[in-house]
Amino acid sequence: MAAKDVKFGNDARVKMLRGVNVLADAVKVTLGPKGRNVVLDKSFGAPTITKDGVSVAREIELEDKFENMGAQMVKEVASKANDAAGDGTTTATVLAQAIVNEGLKAVAAGMNPMDLKRGIDKAVVAAVEELKALSVPCSDSKAIAQVGTISANSDETVGKLIAEAMDKVGKEGVITVEDGTGLEDELDVVEGMQFDRGYLSPYFINKPDTGAVELESPFILLADKKISNIREMLPVLEAVAKAGKPLVIIAEDVEGEALATLVVNTMRGIVKVAAVKAPGFGDRRKAMLQDIATLTGGTVISEEIGMELEKATLEDLGQAKRVVINKDTTTIIDGVGEEAAIQGRVAQIRKQIEEATSDYDREKLQERVAKLAGGVAVIKVGAATEVEMKEKKARVDDALHATRAAVEEGVVAGGGVALVRVAAKIAGLTGQNEDQNVGIKVALRAMEAPLRQIVSNAGEEPSVVANNVKAGDGNYGYNAATEEYGNMIDFGILDPTKVTRSALQYAASVAGLMITTECMVTDLPKGDAPDLGAAGGMGGMGGMGGMM
């Protein structure tokens, strides 16, 4: 086992604080409308330019192991805030730095660290309750656009795009961010259910100009099995041909003789057919087939429940107003499934989302809800260079998370004003002893830090602006972008309550643990390799140089 280096008391805390400050100072320059960029070097490719706090934090590793421990703990604050609300990482880092700095001063002055932590925790619990009381629901497009704009560093086009996307696909809809091809940002909305499987044969194409299969009012056959024998399908094909409607087959696979016969029938015009593979794999495929069945009012033909393809009738088939199949995607528009059945299925999936343990599962389930409930919107980010594209895409992602958080828990006045108002409301809070009172004061003072940092980044004097804001009430604050005072809600400067709440809770949680640290242990740096004394007798070989 490697030898350890151990530091105690003040020595440990000073080192830890230095690490906290290095990381926080790098992150906090990005805060606010006049925040600066940070350039991150990559081991390959061009450097990344970002204003995203968590991206900066993740890049920082310090050489001194004790300092690095401090930095890593603040990195945890940024990551947790990012996981919980998708934004507010810089605010969380600034809050954590302020609490740690003030808290360690109090510890150095002889206060009891555990009581300080209890005081900080008490203040945060009270502050969270006050934040909830200040929160205003965020339901209209204008407010959603404002939240998106602020989170995307005052880029109005991003805010408007996100609001438009939410209008089109609903608050629960899936909105994804992709690289665009031009200079402008674009919004693509896919109505209906789309999945990433295309036609099994190009001979099904009936729109050569677009290279797509478009079928109006088709029947939809859903089979949880491979179809290779055409005999199994003859009864269904004959019934569909009599009905004079097209047929879409969605199955695990359609191959060999079955696929060849379908192609021949289509080309001869006997019956219009298109076949695609079912989306997903394993249990997820079964679930998605069931989703499509619910949406189209059909039944999944599955041998697991004793259904055979030969015995399928028109009643077992789903229907939709239109189906469009491309090389890579299939879109089902206006399925005829009953609204009550669709809502029941959505509720069932939402229950699974609550119980899901992995982010991946949660994301996939959320996609299924969106496909059933509304549709999918894709924001295509346009930029002149790849470096700009990466930076802008990160901002759009942040803005998207912020708007979702705003819809979930409402909004409060932005620009650090909400925390200043909350601190004023709980100023009379007291603990069980003097040390706890100091802890409460530490937390209250830290709540001003985001406002001060925004002002500092804008090149103004933080103390002057903070005093002016504290002299006002309600939503009165300072707009750092235009350098004027007024109502933050009227200025359109809003922060999602969830983002502010998460930032404060995670910052206080980690900072409280750091204040109560008394000892730090790390591996000793490995020394130089030991001198191989045994090889000393071979020195005479140096003379071999003359033989060259």
Swiss-Prot record:
Residues the record lists as binding ATP: 30-33, 51, 87-91, 415, 479-481, 495
SUPFAM superfamilies (alphabetical): GroEL apical domain-like (SSF52029), GroEL equatorial domain-like (SSF48592), GroEL-intermediate domain like (SSF54849)
EC number: 5.6.1.7
MF annotations from Gene Ontology: ATP binding; ATP-dependent protein folding chaperone; isomerase activity; unfolded protein binding
Keyword terms: ATP-binding, Chaperone, Cytoplasm, Isomerase, Nucleotide-binding
GO cellular component annotations of the record: cytoplasm
Localization, UniProt: Cytoplasm
Catalysis performed (reactions): ATP + H2O + a folded polypeptide = ADP + phosphate + an unfolded polypeptide
Enzyme class: isomerase
InterPro entries named among the record's database cross-references: Chaperonin_Cpn60_CS, Cpn60/GroEL, Cpn60/GroEL/TCP-1, GroEL-like_apical_dom_sf, GROEL-like_equatorial_sf, TCP-1-like_intermed_sf
Source organism, top-level taxon: Bacteria
Single biological process term from Gene Ontology: biological process involved in symbiotic interaction
Family: Belongs to the chaperonin (HSP60) family.
Role, per record: Together with its co-chaperonin GroES, plays an essential role in assisting protein folding. The GroEL-GroES system forms a nano-cage that allows encapsulation of the non-native substrate proteins and provides a physical environment optimized to promote and accelerate protein folding.
Assembly notes: Forms a cylinder of 14 subunits composed of two heptameric rings stacked back-to-back. Interacts with the co-chaperonin GroES.
Protein's name in the database: Chaperonin GroEL
Naturally occurring in which organism (per UniProt): Klebsiella aerogenes (strain ATCC 13048 / DSM 30053 / CCUG 1429 / JCM 1235 / KCTC 2190 / NBRC 13534 / NCIMB 10102 / NCTC 10006 / CDC 819-56) (Enterobacter aerogenes)
Gene: groEL
